[in-house]
Amino acid sequence: EKKILKKFEKLYEKNSDIAGWLTIDGTTIDYPVMYTPDDNDYYLHLDFDKNWSDPGTPFIDMNCRPFDDRTDNVLIYGHNMKSGIMFRELLQYEDESFYKKHKNIKFDTVYETGTYEVIGAFRSEIYPDDDTEHYHYYEFFNAADKAEFDEYIDFVKSNTAYDSGVTAEYGDELITLSTCASHTEDGRFVVVARRITGDDK
């Protein structure tokens, strides 16, 4: 059985819904990430101690597997708060100069550490269920094959305002950070990164 990393032991004892911790150096993004596969929106408006909280706590989409048999992509949601907290600062990734200063994202699960490098960042939206015209980034969890993986990466790269020079190969581990954005109704801003280091790299 996998062992909980020492730094997570106390937090895990307090709340075993914790999946890990997300940090982007030089920003306010430094938060626990929750995972409740039976109730996707559980932490939408709850803090780590399960008390009501408007900003909620970042959480992993229930369709992802962040630990054993990890899905190619781990999709993490967080609120965009006017006060600047939670995932507000992700929107700055639209600007290449911000990207250049914040190329790496740290996402440690409770079992292993991981550093990710940003591939791209883009505006999108949540489309109607019957929409077939647009690519739905929020439905990509596991690629059936290389072509499906490459389609996701191509979508990310082609919708990013600058070329990060970073891409991903089929078999790489991805994280996708998603937050609300006001450019359109049901707008979203999305940052995608690939794992470059960790305990097993």
Regions found by a protein language model. Name each.
Residues 1-201:
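Solvent-exposed, non-transmembrane regions of membrane-associated and secreted proteins
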